[in-house]
Amino acid sequence: MKLNVAVQMDPIARINIRGDSTFALLLEAQKRGHGISYYTPDKLSLRGEELVAPLQPLTVRDEVGNHFTLGEPKREALNGFDVVLLRQ
């Protein structure tokens, strides 16, 4: 079963992919066919009673210096995801 995963983490451009456990989780989730969307905690806000963020589709690869691609941001409610992964 494919899951739709939102991941809250530090800026992905600044991580060291060789030692980052969040990055390892993302690689495995992607390998298993799950959809991944990315946001940083400073972008969270409330819309009524919903927690929302500008989420970006995320593709990761095990290449130092070229380890991710982000899609266009779209403001979405976090309760629409199967999994919300908080990694800080």
For each predicted feature, which ranges?
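ATP-binding N-terminal substructure of ATP-dependent carboxylate-amine bond-forming enzymes
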Residues: 1-88
